[in-house]
Amino acid sequence: MQHKKVQMNLYLAFRLLIGTFFLSHGLQKLFGFFGGVDGNGGAVNLFSMFGLAGLIEFIGGLFIFLGLFTSIVAFIASLEMLTAYFMFHVPTGGILPLMQQFNGEPPILFFAAFLVLIAFGAGKWGLERKLLGREIWHQKR
């Protein structure tokens, strides 16, 4: 029983960290936080591909952090990460992240994290479970 409690606590920390980091990328793109996209606080045009990415990252990161529709949001976010990787990172140096000019590791690592979130959902401490009594796509554990 103690082992399962440790697993649940570690998974909660994992979900909160992924949500926070993904949200921070959305804040950077949409509102120019953390130096913005240009290093000087610049934000992207909301009605552009980067604006759509910022919305997915901002809303998706918030929902993942809160544990709200986690699997669905993680699925959408995983598609964004694959798109970012193949459209913007691979053309700068090949399929391997270390060969790329613009560091392709973050989208691949986010993609892997989202696969875990798709598989396991929000977990015990997700807001979705509190509001709906269960998680969509997952049975109560």
Where do the PLM segments sit?
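Extended, low-polarity transmembrane helix blocks
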Residues: 1-31, 47-55, 59, 66-141
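Membrane-interface helix-loop junction between the first two transmembrane segments
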Residues: 29-39
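Perimembrane loop-to-helix junctions flanking transmembrane segments
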Residues: 37-48
